[in-house]
Design a protein with these regions (language model features):
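Solvent-exposed, polar/charged alpha-helical surfaces in well-ordered, non-transmembrane soluble domains
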Residues: 12-22, 26-29, 53-60, 64-67, ...
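Soluble, cytosolic/nucleoplasmic coiled-coil alpha-helices used as oligomeric scaffolds and tethers
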Residues: 34-37, 41, 72-75, 79-82, ...
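Amphipathic alpha-helical interface segments
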Residues: 1-2, 6, 115-118, 201
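Polar/charged, Q/E/K-enriched amphipathic alpha-helical segments with strong coiled-coil propensity
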Residues: 29-56, 176-189
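A cross-kingdom marker for long, charged
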Residues: 126-213
């Protein structure tokens, strides 16, 4: 069964995602009823053990499908953004509106790349340099200076991404103190030249971009 109208690449995974989600949801609901009604007191947890195994099986089936579904959605969004960028250029030329979206597309590509456990540092550094140019062009296009917050956060993300990629490229190890900080969710972003630090700047840039709308 295909979705109508077809939305490739999501059409190929949506039905599998729905089926897996329904199966997982049904098991969770059954578990909730079982424990809410305290039925385990009547069967010495016999059904509870079976439900637990079913839950693990459903979860194992759901997770890869959910990842594929998310990836398909991201692919569609990426294509739409590129199409919108082209439309903006055709309607307005390379205005701040154009460059701000170009910055976001570039930054997202970088963030997706450097979030991986292993990546090509030279390729990442090239993308970071391209982002640096786009940020400078966005700043130049912002004649009024009204969009300083976004330009500043984009510049900060570009810098933090560059510092992290440089660390990976040059194989600079983290200190013992840094390693401890990276294990703490409250301080993880404080580590210099780290992905969490770059990610924090990325999220702030996204917030500032959304405020432009």
């Amino acid at each position: 069964m295909a979705l109508m109208p077809a939305l490739q690449p999501i059409d190929g995974v949506a039905v599998s995602y729905i089926d897996a989600a329904v199966a997982l949801g049904n098991t969770i609901n059954e578990m909730d009823k079982y424990y809410t009604q305290e039925n385990y007191k009547d069967d010495a947890f016999a059904k509870g053990k079976t439900l637990h195994q079913t839950f693990l099986k459903n979860l194992e089936a759901f997770e890869p499908v959910a990842e594929s579904y998310h990836a398909a959605i991201q692919e569609i969004n990426d294509k739409r953004q590129l199409a919108e960028l082209k439309n903006i250029e055709e309607r307005e030329g390379k205005t701040f509106h154009y460059y701000s979206l170009a910055v976001m597309i570039s930054a997202k590509q970088i963030n997706n790349l450097i979030s991986q456990n292993k990546f090509d540092a030279e390729a990442a550094m090239k993308k970071v340099s391209e982002l640096e140019t786009l940020v400078a062009q966005a700043k130049e296009a912002d004649k009024s200076g009204m969009n300083f917050s976004f330009i500043n956060s984009a510049s900060q993300y570009q810098l933090e991404a560059k510092k992290y990629v440089r660390r990976i490229r040059d194989k600079v190890l983290y200190s013992d103190w840094d390693k401890e900080q990276l294990q703490d969710a409250n301080s993880i972003w404080m580590v210099d030249d780290s992905f969490p630090r770059a990610l924090r700047e990325y999220n702030e840039m996204v917030d500032d971009y959304n405020s432009l709308r």
